[in-house]
């Protein structure tokens, strides 16, 4: 159940740092915030605004609150395969997935160039892209990225096979976001706004800057969604080819870094979910833990106090720097025991060790009034960007 920190800030997090609360309070005090900011169970300090926060604004949007990976999110596909139909070793499958889904910072490919060209021909941002940016859009379409982006093969509580994937709008989403954040900061300084944090600078609805940002943001969200779809298609093709059978049953694709116009209590608002997913009644979502723990397929309960939202994952407990200092490759190998993963690159993945994240089971318990669990997944194969 939620805790009211103050009338402008409500939290579902039982495990939350004081710095996280302080950062969220700055956002909640903004005059453009309508009602209260909602903190999800996975909330932690972020760049621009608190990760795991839902920010309702009236007549304005905060580009840094959406963040630099616009449209980052999850996609999960259930197949008509069971655990006993899988080969004894999935190690060859890991190599096959790696060949068709490039990963890593700045990585691109030409595998799906024609599909990328077709998509871009009918989907253009408001900002006129430079030639090198168009090349980036084309080459990074269908690529994973780095950090906590991943592809996983999972089994649910019935031993049914799922493929789960996490990624966003790649380099072009970052570039567009950074450009608009810089414009918002400049306009705020020129207007001599008294902000506690310049990253909370906003665009006012009806201005040219607002219209351009929203158009670019929606385009980047669509790019992220299409990027995940493209990678999922390729991952499924490799899995089904490897097993020799299999058919897709259903697919769930949801953003967790985005803003959209919604009506709550009869009032039209911009609801920004930074590290949160939409959980209106019946909405299906994917909530991952870490690379060695459980993930969940959920249905939203439509809780208005959370602005019909829920967590986007477990949330980091330790920064990447702290995780690297505290844990070794042996620690990571121990926590990934029994799973197929990029063990030969463990030194590049220590900052993603499960112990660097909050307890996903506690996160799910904290939000029992926000979502209903449909399926619990555990990973048997993990491919993560390095």
What are these regions (language model features)?
Residues 65-124:
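A generic, well-ordered mixed alpha/beta core segment in the N-terminal half of proteins
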């Amino acid at each position: 159940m939620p805790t009211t920190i103050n009338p402008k800030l409500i939290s579902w997090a039982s495990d939350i740092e004081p710095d996280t609360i302080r950062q969220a309070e700055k956002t909640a005090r903004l005059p453009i915030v309508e009602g209260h900011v909602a903190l999800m169970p996975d909330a932690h300090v972020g760049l621009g605004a608190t990760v795991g926060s839902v920010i309702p604004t009236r007549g304005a949007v905060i580009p840094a609150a959406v963040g630099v990976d616009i449209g980052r999110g999850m996609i999960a596909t259930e197949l008509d395969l069971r655990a006993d139909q899988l080969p004894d070793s999935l190690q060859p499958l890991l190599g096959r997935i790696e060949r068709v889904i490039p990963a890593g910072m700045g990585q691109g490919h030409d595998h799906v160039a024609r599909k990328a060209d077709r998509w871009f021909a009918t989907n253009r941002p408001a900002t006129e892209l430079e030639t090198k940016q168009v090349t980036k859009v084309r080459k990074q379409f269908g690529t994973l990225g780095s950090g906590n982006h991943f592809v996983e093969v999972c089994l649910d509580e019935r031993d049914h096979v799922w493929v789960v994937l996490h990624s966003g709008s790649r380099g072009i989403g970052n570039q567009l976001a950074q450009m608009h954040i810089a414009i918002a900061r400049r306009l705020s300084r020129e207007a001599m706004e008294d902000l506690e944090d310049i990253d909370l600078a906003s665009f006012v609805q009806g201005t040219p800057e607002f219209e351009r940002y929203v158009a670019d943001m929606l385009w980047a969200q669509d790019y992220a969604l299409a990027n995940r779809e493209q990678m999922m298609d390729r991952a499924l093709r490799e899995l089904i080819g490897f097993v020799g059978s299999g058919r897709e049953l259903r697919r769930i694709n949801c953003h967790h870094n985005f803003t959209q116009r919604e009506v709550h209590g009869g009032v039209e608002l911009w609801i920004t979910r930074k590290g949160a997913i939409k959980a209106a009644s019946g909405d299906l979502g994917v909530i991952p833990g870490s690379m060695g723990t459980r993930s969940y397929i959920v249905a939203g309960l439509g809780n208005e106090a959370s602005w019909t939202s829920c967590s986007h994952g477990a949330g980091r407990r330790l920064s990447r720097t702290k995780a690297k200092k505290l844990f070794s490759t042996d620690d990571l190998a121990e926590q990934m025991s029994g799973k197929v993963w990029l063990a030969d690159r463990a030194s590049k993945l220590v900052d993603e060790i499960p112990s660097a994240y909050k307890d996903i089971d506690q996160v799910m318990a904290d939000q029992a009034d926000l979502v209903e669990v449909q399926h619990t997944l555990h990973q048997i194969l993990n491919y993560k960007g390095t």
